[in-house]
């Protein structure tokens, strides 16, 4: 299983979220990200305001801009914040010594669990219109969102290939393919 793309994504997420800063700054950043997540869910990206996020976070509007260059960048970091634990869990699944079919089950379970625990990411995966417009603003040639989604697809395809080895009957292949892609 090629887990290097996943490791690279996780490293990128950690670098984006946690630049070298003190404990107080990291706590403040975490608080802002948590509040912004709730505001984006409640109001949508377009209607969420930096002022509301600042007030609910207990910081000034200017402080928000010390951590994030724009509302769009804040959204990307909120998505990264929601993704960090998910990618760590995926790495653990890939490193496990269980059979490929069990790995696929665990991967799919984590995806369902992630959608339940991270509704903002679920909106991204569902190609929610508000989310797509917001991400177009921030993804200025960096391909952050594209890389995230491609990594998930790459992992899923690798797991499916491992499960559908040449020893697997055509009927079983169809069954697994239908579970994954339908």
How should each PLM-predicted stretch be described?
Residues 34, 101-119, 174-178:
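Amphipathic alpha-helical segments that line or abut small-molecule/effector binding pockets
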Residues 46, 60, 69-71, 99:
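Short coil/turn motifs that cap or connect alpha-helices
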Residues 36, 58-68:
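Short hydrophobic/aromatic patch on the recognition helix
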Residues 106, 115-140:
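Amphipathic alpha-helical segments used for helix-helix packing
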Residues 1-43, 47-56, 73:
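Basic, helix-initiating cap at the start of DNA-binding domains
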Residues 27-38, 42, 56, 73-96, ...:
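Alpha-helical structural segments
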Residues 84, 132-165, 171-178:
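Amphipathic alpha-helical packing segments from all-alpha helical-bundle domains
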